[in-house]
Amino acid sequence: MAATAVAICLATGFAYAKQTTNLTDDARQATSVETTNLTDGSQQKASVTEKDPRPGGERTVLKNWEAGKTISSLTLRGYDLNKCFMSEPIPNRVFERMQGKSYKKGCTVSRESLRYVKVLHWNDKGKICLGELVCHKSIANDLVEIFETLFAKKYPIERMVLIDNYGADDLKSMEANNTSCFNFRYVAGTKVPSNHSYGKAIDLNPLYNPYVRKAANGKKTVSPLSAQRYADRSKDFKYKIDRNDLAYKEFRKRGFTWGGSWKRSQDYQHFEKK
């Protein structure tokens, strides 16, 4: 993880030394330093743990983790990045947001089996965004590691807030190009719980990576409908996921399967782990 942390710092423009200890899936420790190049060629390192060089408003956004908002790289200077890439049991305030939406009445998945994940991500405008997901605890560390790597490489993700912001409406979330994970729902047209119901599936940049099904008569179904132009995967466009894509490689490396590889239909946004 240290190599990823260094890359993150290069991406944000400041130095950061990170050491991790495997305490639990939610516990990590870190040390932050700022490096100054001196005129004699040597380097001077100083702790910046208490340094707060940017406007107070953004630090409040970061402290309260106001997902969906953007911050400057200066806001992260001296900030413990472990707090920006982490998973934890679902806080009460988050669980309240989920009630009657992604966590519906009759949900058979226990709160204790789920985790709230915080990550940073870049959008296509070069802005740092605060992201959030709810997932199954078995993939929480995978997601933290994947999104650390994607952030370090400045991989663009337009939006990442809980699907509850869209009333747990999958179509509305996809149309907003919102990356999401847990949502207790059934596979369309069935009474079979989707892998999203268990928090073991994630939809990444879904508007640009739609669900596509071609019938025997040649008729093509695309979801969401507003993503028709992105159903042709021979074209190049932003946020596109294919086998050369960094996100594809990172998810596959950790044992996830990709919906874009399915035979009867393709769900290009979709990664899941059994």
What spans do the regions from the language model cover?
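Boundary at the C-terminal end of the N-terminal hydrophobic targeting segment
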Residues: A15-A17
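Active-site-adjacent loop/helix surface patches within enzyme catalytic domains
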Residues: P156-K200, P206-Y211
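N-terminal module-boundary/linker segments of secreted carbohydrate-active enzymes
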Residues: D40-W122
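Catalytic cores and adjacent binding grooves of peptidoglycan-active enzymes
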Residues: E50-W65, Y186-P193, Y198-K274
